[in-house]
Amino acid sequence: MKNLITLLIILVFSSVYSQSTYLHCGQLFDSKKAKFFGPHTIVIDGEKITSVAKGYVNPKSENDIFIDLKSKTVYPGFIDMHVHIETQVPQSIIQLSQSKTADIAFTSSVYARKTLMAGFTTIRDLGGVGVNISLRDAINEGKVIGPRIFTAGNILSSTGGHGDFTNGTKKESYGILGPKDGIVDSPDDARKAVRQRYKNGADWIKITATGGVLDISKSDANPQFTNEEIYTITKTASDYGLKVAAHAHGDEGMYRAVANGVKTIEHGTLIKERTMDLMISKKAYLVPTISAGKFVAKMAETPNFFHPLIEEKARKIGPQIQNTFNRAYKYGVPILFGTDSGVSPHGENAKEFIYMNEAGMPINESLHIATFENAKILDMENSLGQI
C-alpha cells in the first residue's frame, strides 16, 4: 500500500498556492468503472480538480506547479464508513465516558491527522461523546487538519444495551439516563433522542441494535430494540433528512433493523440468509469492519487486557467477522467499506483492503467500494469518491 498516492497531498499544495497544479500520473484509478488506466494528467486549481486528460500535459505557465507521479498510481481519497475518531484501542466503552472532554478533543485531532495521512480523506464517525461534531466543524473551518467527517454524534442504546456507557459502573455515578443521553426505552424516547441529535448537529443516527463486545455485560448478540422503537427512530430521522446505521452482531436485531428502515448494518457477524435476502431487497448495506474483528480477537489473547466479560465476547465474535463478509459478499449483499478504526488503531485503515481480498473480493472492487459506492451512500457522489 506504500505506493498508493491519494489526492490529499495535492490538496495541501493547492490550498497554499494559487497557481494551477499539474500531476503526471503513471496510472489513474477510475472508481466508477473500477478500472486502472495508463498515463493521465490531473490539473488542480485552488482546491478543485478542473481537468483530467489522457497522457502527459505540460504546465501552461512557469508559475504552475508540476508534480511527477509517473511511477505512482493515483486514487481518489478513500472513504471509511465506520470510524470512532474520539478513541483508540479502548479496553471498554467506559473509558471514553470517563475521559475529560478536553483530553478527548486533543487526542481526536491527532487521530484525525493520522487518518488523513493514511489516505482517507472522508470518514463516517459512528459514535462518541459529541466531540466528533466539534471536530468536524473545526476541520471544515480549517482550524484542524483532518478528513471530512460525517458523524452520528453520540449513539442510541437501550438501558443496559451495548451503547449504555454506565454498564459496569456504580448506579449512583450517573443517575437516571434518558433520550438526551442516548438511552431509548420506548418509541417516545426514540423520537426525542433523534430530535436531540439533529439539534446537536449529527449527520447520521447510530443505534446499537444488538449486544456488542466492548461493553461490560454478558450480551453480545441479543436484540436490544423493539420493532416499534426502531421504526420510530428511522421515521423521525427521515423527517429530518438523516439516515440510520445499526451496530448488530445477532441476526434477530439485524433483521428488525433492516425491516424497519435502517440503511447500514455494522459488523453483521451472525447474519442469516433471511436477513441477507431482506438487505438485498431493501438495498441495505453491510459494513464488515474486519479490521476490528481481527484486532479484538488478537487483544483477547493478551492477559488481562480486557475485562473477563469482554474477553469472552471478543474471542467469540472477533474471529467470525471476516468469514461473515465472505458469506455476505458471495450471497450478493450490498457492501460498503468500513474498518471500525478506533477499536483498531487509527491510520491502519487500509489493512481492510487486504482482509477483504483475503475473503474473496478483488482489490479493484474494494477500491471501487471505498470511493464511489461510499460516496453514494453519503449522497456525495458528485463531489467525492472519483477523479
Predicted features, each with a name:
Residues K72-E141, T159-T166, E228, E252, ...:
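Metal-associated gating/positioning segment near the N- to mid-region
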Residues D189-L286, R315-P334:
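Histidine/acidic residue-rich metal-binding segments in metalloenzymes
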Residues M1-S20:
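Bacterial Sec-dependent N-terminal signal peptides
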Residues L28, K32-Y75:
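Histidine-rich, glycine-flanked metal-binding segment
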Residues S108-N132, I145-I155, A202-D215, K243, ...:
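Divalent metal-dependent hydrolysis catalytic cores, especially in the metallo-beta-lactamase
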Residues T87-D103, R113, T159-G178, V213-T226, ...:
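Active-site gating loops and adjacent loop-to-helix segments of metal-dependent hydrolytic enzymes
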Residues D239-K243, P308-L309, K316-I387:
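His/Asp/Glu-enriched, well-ordered alpha-helical/loop segment
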Residues V89-I93, G161-H162, D215-I216, M254-N260, ...:
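Histidine/acidic-residue-rich catalytic or RNA/ligand-binding cores of hydrolases
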